[in-house]
Amino acid sequence: MNFNEFVNEVKDNIKLFLPKDYENAEVSTMECQKLNRAYTGLMVRKEGEMLTPTINLNQLYEAYKAQPGVTMETVCRKIADIVIEAPIQVDLKAILNYEDVKDKLFIRVSSAEANKEVLENAPHQLKEDLAITYHVAVGKDQDGLSSMFIKNDLLEQYGISAEQLHEDAMKSSPHVMIPEVSSIGALIDEMYQKNILMLTPDEREMLQETLQESSEMPTFFVVTNTDRIDGAGVIFYPEFMDSMGELLGNDFFILPSSIHEMLVLPDDGQVDAEMLRDMVKEVNATQVAPAERLTNDVYHFDTKDHVFEKADRFTERQKEKEAQAAKTEKAGKEQPDQKLKTKKHDMEL
């Protein structure tokens, strides 16, 4: 069964697995463009409902293909459970009122290149090749955070400028998505403590080796939020990079680990940008899902000039500064000494 046949099968049969109050529900599909991904979404809207969950059919199709024994009846029952158990309980009027959502705004960071089409229809700010976008936290429970992506039409509804939206989102983000900084070693240790009782002897030995290796590596810090989901934007919180520089007592490199976190490494002369860039490329290619990747580049924060930029650009600026300093010094040496000449006066009594 190909994907189109799968979609039609779900659309034609989903109501057979839903309660009686869904018999007049409207079943539709639409192409969804989200940050970092595009998919075909299924919506089942009961009469009178303003909002309804959009179910990712691409994701369900991949799961269906990966399990040959699964029937379409099982798939439809799964979708029906999602429809029934996950209605969106949202006050639509409140979402459309900017004063009601202003304190629920938060930012996300994504690849500007990978999301070019989506960003054409959404307010955003670029930080090099990273894009900051704006979202409203709709609800939060044990399953995670429900949110709404602010696009141009919603911004127009709010009647504010993109600049005002950015300013307000920067104020509220640290309260909605609380920042968290920890060392790589601490995270591995936390994992070790949580899982140690469930590990086999071989797994336990492997984790202990990883802990040993991490203690010999340069000190990386993980910048994310307390939920550790969509936490890469924390690096752009107001004064965050300045505070990080004070903590480290140094400039630092920033590695785009994924949309969920950034890695920070002090620029103490032990590593160079090229080595770090190779590391990012390898990790992206082997360990990060395509939908969660940011970029293959490495960034740098200059604590003296308070500049966030690509590491290559920082190196260029330093060379330009050194060249200018050498030029100024040379000009100073070539300038002749200007000694004060005293005029002799004849004095007569």
Placement of each model-derived feature along the sequence:
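C-terminal structured domain segments
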Residues: S257-L263, D267-L294
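Short amphipathic alpha-helix segments
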Residues: A232-G245
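Charged, alpha-helical interface segments at or near domain boundaries
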Residues: S28-V223
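N-terminal alpha-helical "arm" segments
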Residues: M1-N36
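Basic, alpha-helical nucleic-acid-binding regions used in initiation and control of genome expression
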Residues: N2-F3, P19, V70-R77, A285-Q287
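Helix-rich interaction surfaces within compact, conserved domain-sized segments
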Residues: M279-E309, F314-T315
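Non-Sec secretion/translocation targeting segments of pathogen effectors
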Residues: A325-L349
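A short linear hydrophobic-aromatic micro-motif
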Residues: N250-I254
